[in-house]
Amino acid sequence: MYDKFKPEQAVGLMDFVRAAKSCIKEISPDELKAKLNAKEDFLLVDVRESSEFEHGRISGAHLVPRGIIEAAADTSYPKHYPPLSGARNQQIVVYCATSGRSAMAAAVLQMMGYKNVLNLAGGYTRWEIEGNPVVREAEY
């Protein structure tokens, strides 16, 4: 993804999001809901910040903020996150608030060798607006 930009070019956030979206696959809220209802085996990763996660999330999601995704996914890093770092060959669905951060996270995971990463189109915002179930309290 980064090879599309030359050092002399000034780039902004949306340039990175567009570049990421050009090389990843997305899943619609309806498709994700069907996967959840069918109890398919995949890892659901919320890349928002913890304060966003605490206000509401999709049931079963693992919180791995975008700012630490590379460290969490790298088994050679001492503080990696085993559910993510061990899912290299498993399907992973990532989401954020509107799908920008998660698009970049999906692209990075692919660059790190993850084989089957999907980004939730429209993110948590679209998921919630479309009336899909959310969790607003702790899950144990």
Task: Walk through the language-model features, giving the residues of each.
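Rhodanese-like catalytic fold shared by cysteine-dependent sulfurtransferases
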Residues: M1-F42, S50-Q91, G100-Y140
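Short, surface-exposed ligand- or partner-binding patches at beta-edge/loop junctions that are enriched
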Residues: Y95
